[in-house]
Amino acid sequence: SISACNGLKGHFLIEPLKLSDSEKTDLLNRSHDNAQLSPINLVVAVIMAHEMGHGMVLPGTK
């Protein structure tokens, strides 16, 4: 399903972030509450995590 696919994308995006377990759990829970998590929301979540000073590693970046 589309929501399951987006949920998986959320996991893959969140995993590289240097988040504590509680932060990851909170972010995943909020993402999963959003049945139709859009790519824009995922991008915003990644940007927000970056802005908060977490080390971010994205595929294709060094």
Curated annotation (Swiss-Prot):
List of glycosylated residues: 29
Hydrolase found in the keyword field: yes
Keyword Metal-binding: yes
Organism superkingdom: Eukaryota
Keywords assigned by UniProt, alphabetized: Cell adhesion impairing toxin, Glycoprotein, Hemostasis impairing toxin, Hydrolase, Metal-binding, Metalloprotease, Platelet aggregation inhibiting toxin, Protease, Secreted, Toxin, Zinc
Localization: Secreted
GO molecular function: metal ion binding; metallopeptidase activity; toxin activity
One GO CC annotation: extracellular region
Primary location class: secreted
Domain Peptidase M12B: 24-54
Post-translational modification: The N-terminus is blocked.
Regulation of this protein's activity per its record: Inhibited by EDTA, and 1,10-phenanthroline.
Residues that bind Zn(2+): 50, 54
Disulfide bonds: none
Tissue expression: Expressed by the venom gland.
Enzyme Commission numbers on file: 3.4.24.-
Cofactor note: Binds 1 zinc ion per subunit.
Family to which this protein belongs: Belongs to the venom metalloproteinase (M12B) family. P-III subfamily. P-IIIc sub-subfamily.
Assembly and interaction partners: Dimer.
Other notes: Negative results: has no effect on alpha-2/beta-1 (ITGA2/ITGB1) integrin. Does not have hemorrhagic activity.
Free-text function comment from the UniProt entry: Snake venom Zinc metalloproteinase that inhibits ADP-induced platelet aggregation and inhibits the alpha-5/beta-1 (ITGA5/ITGB1) integrin, a fibronectin receptor. Has caseinolytic activity. Induces the detachment of cells that are bound to fibronectin.
Protein name, UniProt field: Zinc metalloproteinase-disintegrin-like BaG
Source organism of this protein record: Bothrops alternatus
